Design a protein with these regions (language model features):
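Secretory targeting and sorting signals
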Residues: 1-11
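Small-side-chain structural scaffolding
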Residues: 8-10, 70, 102-105, 124-126
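Surface cap/lid and interfacial helix-loop subdomains adjacent to catalytic sites
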Residues: 14-61, 65-88, 111-227
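Gly/Ala-rich beta-loop-alpha elbow adjacent to hydrolase catalytic centers
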Residues: 93-109
Length: 227
């Protein structure tokens, strides 16, 4: 408010900026997946890849605290985008996470307020849902099977838990290295996939979205076992 001639007058509303697409990247433990996820040529629609820092080095062994720190840092990045940089709420935002980073990204995709133009992509989410899947009898992710809450929460993610369209990708039993037991735990043998399958995604976000489509999706979820 300001005054003119003794009369209070409302200040004109600040016009939001039209900002280009951005891709917030949360890599896995010891930066797994970060190299390709941060390549601009693999980002969708010319989005600018921005790494969200969080504790994920070898010495960072408190996974619960690590995920919480990542969630806080990602929310800060979103605040800076919409408030500090005054970007329009229609600015295209991709939130992409792999493994430990998928737990971070998925938590924010479940809780971020509505009304924004966000697309999620999760590689090897340990809480991956078993429903809405292209794989009959899909068992879902490892952390969803733990008897106590794991980092990122307890149980498999709710079928309709995401607030924004989210593509979740997991290497299944027919992939070259077998099932990735982090996101597809059908048996104890699938745990071997942490070494033979888990590190070997393309991390080509643009190609994955071209292959499987961007949202909207039913229940904001497109759940894909590869191949």
């Amino acid at each position: 408010m300001f005054t003119t001639g003794g009369t209070a007058v409302a200040a004109p509303a600040k016009t939001a900026n039209a900002c280009g697409p951005v891709m917030f990247v949360l890599p896995g433990y010891q930066d797994g997946g970060a190299f390709n996820l941060l390549k601009p040529e693999l980002a969708p629609n010319g989005a600018n890849p921005v790494r969200i820092p969080f504790p994920n080095a070898q010495q960072d062994i408190n996974l619960y605290a690590d995920v919480d720190a990542g969630v806080a840092n990602l929310r800060t990045a979103l605040y800076n985008l919409y408030v500090t940089s005054n970007c329009d709420l229609n600015t295209k935002v991709y939130i992409v996470g792999f493994s430990l980073g998928a737990l971070v990204a998925g938590t924010v995709l479940e809780t971020e307020p509505p009304g924004r133009n966000i697309q999620g992509v999760l590689f090897s989410d340990g809480r991956r849902q078993s429903g809405e899947s292209n794989w009959p009898g899909d068992p879902g992710g490892l952390i969803g099977k733990l008897p106590v809450p794991g980092p990122g929460g307890a149980g498999l993610r709710p079928l309709d838990g995401f607030k924004y369209p989210t593509l979740t990708v997991c290497n299944g039993p027919r992939s070259a290295g077998g099932a990735d037991g982090i996101c597809f735990l059908g048996s104890v043998a699938d745990l071997n996939g942490y070494f033979t399958s888990h590190p070997f995604y393309t991390f080509d976000v643009g190609a994955e979205l071209r292959a499987h489509g961007e949202g909207p999706y039913p229940n904001n979820l497109r759940n894909r076992v590869i191949p």
